[in-house]
């Protein structure tokens, strides 16, 4: 949620941000008007309550013969106070409802526009060259006995798979490599809940216009998370933190996404699935340190890409493709040989105080007051990375060379061999 002070004092900042996102600029003006009405309602309530308190003292001190009439007046006044309180509460709810529709103000320099309007910041590693026709990750996975889409569909439906044998071992190895990288950089590991309450899902910004992407268990009123970011953001809800140094967490979880808007996209293999595993970095820090921490998260992601021998690029995501919570997001995309293009493997977002303000996660300032912390997140490994690893390191016979950094996590295995070879 945005800062009401920013709304009142710098509405043009929000107007420019909304315009860059392709969202309604009118929401800012609506919020300003509702804020005026809210403050007027609160003032009216507080004045009536002060009058009620003063009248109560008068009743207490009045002679006995006057009290009956004064008590009747006090009861009438109490009714007016209650009514004013209800009006103020309704105005507060309207204001919060409008505020929640306004996206996080984007950081200066974020490109305007939609999904295709990103800026390429760098490209690392050359395009892999093969002296043969490369196989895609599913063909390789089937040769290796590593990916079974048919039985995944039989058991659970489209966009589900079994990772078996070398596939299961490869994912576990990848996740453990990422976990060790996180530990080396001071992250505390957590295995997080994958079911969360509505207020936590709402607080992180995942129940807005894309709520149809989320699985909801209606009977229990719980949501399946598409990232451990949600649980990690809720971990310190309603708390006052010491963020003299950043609090860094690495959440390991199974993730679930409905992919409601992805009909016909990436229907082959495990690029876009309903269930996957992910190791997510999540940081609480001081707002003034958020941009520097964002750069660190990106650097750690790049270290992982380089450790796995993947060619990649980094893009600065355009404002209209950020989602409501992020003020800036970098995507790291790996080259997928059989598609002849880069595909997103990971992203990292600076959410500023947007999530913390909703979830009441605060720190104490030097003056002793409390203020919302900044939150950031970034993926360090996920199931989709297997796609790039298999395709990049494949050999003509269908075997796959294991990146050196993964070998200790696979018992020293250097080559993934096709079944029966």
Swiss-Prot record:
Catalyzes the attachment of serine to tRNA(Ser). Is also able to aminoacylate tRNA(Sec) with serine, to form the misacylated tRNA L-seryl-tRNA(Sec), which will be further converted into selenocysteinyl-tRNA(Sec). GO terms for biological process: selenocysteine biosynthetic process; seryl-tRNA aminoacylation. One of its GO terms (molecular function) is ATP binding. It catalyses: tRNA(Ser) + L-serine + ATP = L-seryl-tRNA(Ser) + AMP + diphosphate + H(+); tRNA(Sec) + L-serine + ATP = L-seryl-tRNA(Sec) + AMP + diphosphate + H(+). L-serine binds at residues 227-229, 280, 379. It is found in: Cytoplasm. Its EC number is 6.1.1.11. GO terms for cellular component: cytoplasm. Belongs to the class-II aminoacyl-tRNA synthetase family. Type-1 seryl-tRNA synthetase subfamily. InterPro entries: aa-tRNA-synt_IIb, aa-tRNA-synth_II, aa-tRNA-synth_II/BPL/LPL, Ser-tRNA-ligase_type_1, Ser-tRNA-synth_1_N, SerRS_1_N_sf, SerRS_core, tRNA-bd_arm. SUPFAM superfamilies: Class II aaRS and biotin synthetases, tRNA-binding arm. Its main location: cytoplasm. This is Serine--tRNA ligase. Pathway: Aminoacyl-tRNA biosynthesis; selenocysteinyl-tRNA(Sec) biosynthesis; L-seryl-tRNA(Sec) from L-serine and tRNA(Sec): step 1/1. Homodimer. The tRNA molecule binds across the dimer. The keyword Manganese does not apply. Keywords: Aminoacyl-tRNA synthetase, ATP-binding, Cytoplasm, Ligase, Nucleotide-binding, Protein biosynthesis. Consists of two distinct domains, a catalytic core and a N-terminal extension that is involved in tRNA binding. HAMAP family: Ser_tRNA_synth_type1 (MF_00176). ATP binds at residues 257-259, 273, 344-347. It comes from the Bacteria.
């Amino acid at each position: 949620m945005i800062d009401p002070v920013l709304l009142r004092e710098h509405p043009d900042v929000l107007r420019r941000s909304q315009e860059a996102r392709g969202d309604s600029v009118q929401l800012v003006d609506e919020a300003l008007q509702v804020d005026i009405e809210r403050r007027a309602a609160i003032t009216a309530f507080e004045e009536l309550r002060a009058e009620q308190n003063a009248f109560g003292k008068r009743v207490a001190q009045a002679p006995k013969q006057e009290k009956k009439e004064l008590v009747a007046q006090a009861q009438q006044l109490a009714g007016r106070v209650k009514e004013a309180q209800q009006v103020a509460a309704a105005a507060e709810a309207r204001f919060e409802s409008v505020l929640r529709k306004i996206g996080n103000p984007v950081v200066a320099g974020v490109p305007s526009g939609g999904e295709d309007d990103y800026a390429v910041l760098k490209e690392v590693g050359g395009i892999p060259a093969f002296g043969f026709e490369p196989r895609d990750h599913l063909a390789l996975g089937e040769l290796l006995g590593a990916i079974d889409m048919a039985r995944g569909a039989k058991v659970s439906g489209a966009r589900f798979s079994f990772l078996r044998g070398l596939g299961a071992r490869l994912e576990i190895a990848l996740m453990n490599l990422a976990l060790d990288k996180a530990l080396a950089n001071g992250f505390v590991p957590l295995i997080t809940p994958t079911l969360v309450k509505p207020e936590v899902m709402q607080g992180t910004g995942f129940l807005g216009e894309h709520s149809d992407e989320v699985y909801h268990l209606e009977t229990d009123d719980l949501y399946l998370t598409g990232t451990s970011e949600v649980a990690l953001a809720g971990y310190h809800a309603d708390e006052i933190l010491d963020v003299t140094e950043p609090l860094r967490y690495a959440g390991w979880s199974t993730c679930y996404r409905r992919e409601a808007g992805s009909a016909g996209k990436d229907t082959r293999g495990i690029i876009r699935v309903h269930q996957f595993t992910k190791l997510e970095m999540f940081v609480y820090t001081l707002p003034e340190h958020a941009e520097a921490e964002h750069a660190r998260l990106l650097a750690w992601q790049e270290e992982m890409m380089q450790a796995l021998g993947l060619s990649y690029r980094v893009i600065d995501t355009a404002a209209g493709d950020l989602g409501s919570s992020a003020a800036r997001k970098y995507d790291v995309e790996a080259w997928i040989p059989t598609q002849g293009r880069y595909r997103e493997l990971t992203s990292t977002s600076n959410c500023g105080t947007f999530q913390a303000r909703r979830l009441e996660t605060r720190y104490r300032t030097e003056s002793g007051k409390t203020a919302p912390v900044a939150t950031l997140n970034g993926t360090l490994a996920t199931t989709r990375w297997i796609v790039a690893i298999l395709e990049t390191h494949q050999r003509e016979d269908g075997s796959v060379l294991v990146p050196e950094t993964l070998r200790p996590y696979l018992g020293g295995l250097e080559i993934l061999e096709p079944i029966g070879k």
